[in-house]
């Protein structure tokens, strides 16, 4: 059985015109059973003027004070930090921002094109994506390092057999 206690309902429920003139036990806007919908544009009824001086001007403030978030969602809202929209900025600002982004993308793409030109011709058979270009460059750099320093390439393959004497003197800890 339900062990929660509920407030007892009044003996008589009045739904007619006289209900507007009944004395209230507490202000109606503090009663959790009453849903208040305020419209700031409409004038306040004269019969409740003595009970309304504590009401805030904005219905959003009333909702925030009594119930928390005015629009509770059952899931978290993504990107809550992005409250600024494009329409808050002028068209000149947006054009400049877009131009800066185009320039940035152009520079990045030129960098990848230059990197592709330095790769061996084996990699140039097909168009490489940015990730494939970076992976090919890493492989090619390690291949070139193994040609320059054959001892270090053996050390990388077998790290346990490396001796302290094979380290670069600048990297050796004294």
Swiss-Prot record:
Helix-loop-helix motif: annotated span: 106-144
Expression (tissue specificity): Expressed in the salivary duct cells. Also expressed at lower levels in testis and epididymis. Expressed in the olfactory epithelium (OE), in a subset of apical microvillar cells.
Residues annotated as domain bHLH: 92-144
Region (Basic motif): 92-105
Keywords: DNA-binding, Nucleus, Repressor, Transcription, Transcription regulation
GO MF annotations in UniProt: DNA binding; DNA-binding transcription repressor activity, RNA polymerase II-specific; protein dimerization activity; RNA polymerase II transcription regulatory region sequence-specific DNA binding
PROSITE patterns per UniProt: BHLH
Positions of region (Disordered): 153-174
Pfam families per the UniProt record, alphabetical: HLH (PF00010)
Keyword presence, Hydrolase: no
Induction record: Following injury of the olfactory epithelium (OE) in 3-4 week olds, up-regulated in the multipotent horizontal basal cells (HBCs) at between 1 and 28 days later.
GO biological processes: epithelium development; negative regulation of transcription by RNA polymerase II; regulation of transcription by RNA polymerase II; salivary gland development; sensory epithelium regeneration; tissue homeostasis
One GO location term (cellular component): transcription regulator complex
Localization terms from the record: Nucleus
Gene3D superfamilies per UniProt: Helix-loop-helix DNA-binding domain
Knocked-out gene: effects: Viable and fertile. Salivary glands develop, but the submandibular glands are consistently smaller and overall levels of cell proliferation lower. Expression of cation-chloride cotransporter Nkcc1 is dramatically reduced in salivary ducts. No obvious morphological changes in the olfactory epithelium (OE).
Cited function: Transcriptional repressor. Inhibits myogenesis. Plays a role in progenitor cells which differentiate into ductal and acinar, but not myoepithelial, cell lineages in the salivary glands. Involved in the functions of the microvillar cells and Bowman's glands and probably, in a non-cell-autonomous manner, in the development or regeneration of a complete olfactory epithelium (OE).
PANTHER family, per the entry: BASIC HELIX-LOOP-HELIX TRANSCRIPTION FACTOR, TWIST, BHLH DOMAIN-CONTAINING PROTEIN
Quaternary structure, from the entry: Efficient DNA binding requires dimerization with another bHLH protein.
Protein name, as recorded: Achaete-scute homolog 3
Biological source species: Mus musculus (Mouse)
Gene: Ascl3
